[in-house]
Curated annotation (Swiss-Prot):
This is Two-component response regulator PhoP. The lineage of its organism: Bacteria, Pseudomonadati, Pseudomonadota, Gammaproteobacteria, Pseudomonadales. Residues 124-222 bind DNA. It comes from Pseudomonas aeruginosa (strain ATCC 15692 / DSM 22644 / CIP 104116 / JCM 14847 / LMG 12228 / 1C / PRS 101 / PAO1). It comes from the Bacteria. The modification 4-aspartylphosphate is found at D51. One of its GO terms (molecular function) is phosphorelay response regulator activity. PANTHER family: REGULATOR OF RPOS (PTHR48111), TRANSCRIPTIONAL REGULATORY PROTEIN PHOP (PTHR48111:SF71). One of its GO terms (biological process) is regulation of DNA-templated transcription.
Length: 225
């Protein structure tokens, strides 16, 4: 699972990053709301852990902003404030659960797992754009209900472009998604993969949803739902 941790205390942030990573999660750990909003605009997340006492924009305001943007992933509050009013305000803002500092990691882990289990039945399972349906569970693309034979990397590019539909996506961002640990990878690989993906989609009834924006990247032109 991809988790977002928003915590301004550096030691605690590092501890959560390390321990949650040891549990098999991919963790984005950031110190403030501004960086958190940037990360959620760029990447998919399955759950967020947010400290209420953030510098600048507060944790409560961050939660409200995420919900106003339509972000539906579960949110767990971390707070040093133990009174009932803070908990009520957090839940009213859109959080799903809370843990009061100081806490045992095992308690946090149990609450996170419970949130993930409860939310699993409500996670979007498809993305649709015109005749194209992306089945997120089966990792499969269909055009006019007919499967499109995509490689794993072609599928990942298509999913990323559809999740960021009607936004220009730079080749560098696609490189980060496909090869996060390979800084030497030639960016021309992306051009080859996108070219193959286009040909496969076009072969299915002439569907052409991916445009090239010269000097900037790629644009999935169809509105997704």
């Amino acid at each position: 699972m991809k988790l977002l941790v928003v915590e301004d205390e550096a030691l605690l942030r590092h501890h959560l990053y390390t321990r949650l990573g040891e549990q098999g999660h991919v963790v984005d750990a950031v110190p403030d709301a501004e960086e958190a909003l940037y990360r959620v605009s760029e990447y998919h997340h399955d759950l967020a852990v947010i400290d209420l006492g953030l510098p600048g924009m507060s944790g409560l305001d961050l939660i409200r902003e995420l919900r106003s943007q339509g972000k539906s992933f579960p949110i767990l509050i971390l707070t040093a404030r133990g009174n009932w009013q803070d908990k009520v305000e957090g839940l009213a803002a859109g959080a799903d659960d809370y843990v009061v500092k100081p806490f045992q990691f095992e308690e946090l882990e149990a609450r996170l797992n419970a949130l993930l289990r409860r939310s699993s039945g409500f996670v979007q399972s498809t993305i649709e754009a015109g005749p194209l349906v992306l089945d997120l569970n089966r990792k499969q693309a269909l055009v006019e209900e007919q499967p499109v034979a995509l490689t794993a990397y072609e599928y990942r590019i298509l999913e990323y472009l559809m999740r960021h539909h009607q936004q220009v996506v730079a080749k560098e961002r696609l490189m980060e998604q496909l090869y996060p640990d390979d800084e030497e990878r030639d960016a021309n690989v992306i051009e080859v993969l996108v070219g193959r993906l286009r040909r496969k989609l076009e072969a299915c009834g002439g569907f052409k949803p991916i445009d090239t924006v010269r000097g900037q990247g790629y644009l999935f032109t169809e509105r997704c739902r």
